[in-house]
């Protein structure tokens, strides 16, 4: 009996040797895969559509990044509440996931980022990161509690940790820090931990 030939199957390349140079470690590419059409991705298309609706309605807004079911849009100072109502009422982002801050010390600004989600049919699991930057020396943003009620404790924590002041928030007292804390907010980049 003759052994059967597997000539029609491509040979599997040997794994690269430990310590091999990048040139030696390259796996030969399959030329036929380079020409393969990219499969449509409705989740990515929907995320791009959402971003386009925000950036066309609010000039100066910028799409920071987009992935399937995930996108980040930054908005100009002073319009985040308008954009938030639009995201909720027209785009189906019906609940808040969390709120965070980013200290851009080199730019002398603080960024507030709202991560909002959707349970709208056809858009379940989508997350919009909606952000606005404010000056570090005047870190005031409007509260979005009237847009998403669940923002209350998230804004409170972000106020405590970054020093962002949420105008109109009913209670910005400490959640985690001692009541008599009088140092910089601990997640600011210029905060120095005692003993360091």
Predicted regions and their residues:
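Terminal low-complexity/charged segments
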Residues: 1-196
């Amino acid at each position: 009996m003759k052994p059967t030939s597997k000539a029609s199957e491509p040979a599997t390349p040997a794994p690269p040797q430990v310590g091999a140079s990048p040139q030696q470690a390259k796996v030969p590419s399959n030329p036929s895969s380079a020409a393969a059409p990219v499969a449509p991705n409705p989740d990515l298309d929907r995320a791009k559509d959402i971003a386009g609706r925000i950036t066309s309605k609010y000039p100066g807004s910028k799409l920071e990044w987009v992935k399937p079911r995930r996108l980040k849009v930054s908005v100009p100072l002073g319009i985040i509440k308008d954009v938030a109502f639009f995201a909720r009422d027209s785009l189906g982002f019906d609940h808040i996931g969390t709120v965070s801050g980013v200290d851009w010390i080199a730019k002398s600004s603080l960024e507030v980022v709202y991560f909002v989600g959707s349970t709208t049919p056809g858009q379940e699991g989508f997350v919009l990161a909606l952000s606005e930057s404010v000056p570090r020396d005047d870190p005031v943003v409007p509260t979005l509690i009237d847009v998403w009620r669940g923002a209350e404790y998230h804004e409170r924590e972000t106020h405590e940790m970054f020093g962002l002041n949420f105008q109109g928030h009913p209670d910005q007292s400490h959640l985690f820090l001692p009541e008599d804390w009088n140092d910089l907010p601990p997640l600011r980049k210029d905060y120095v931990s005692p003993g360091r």
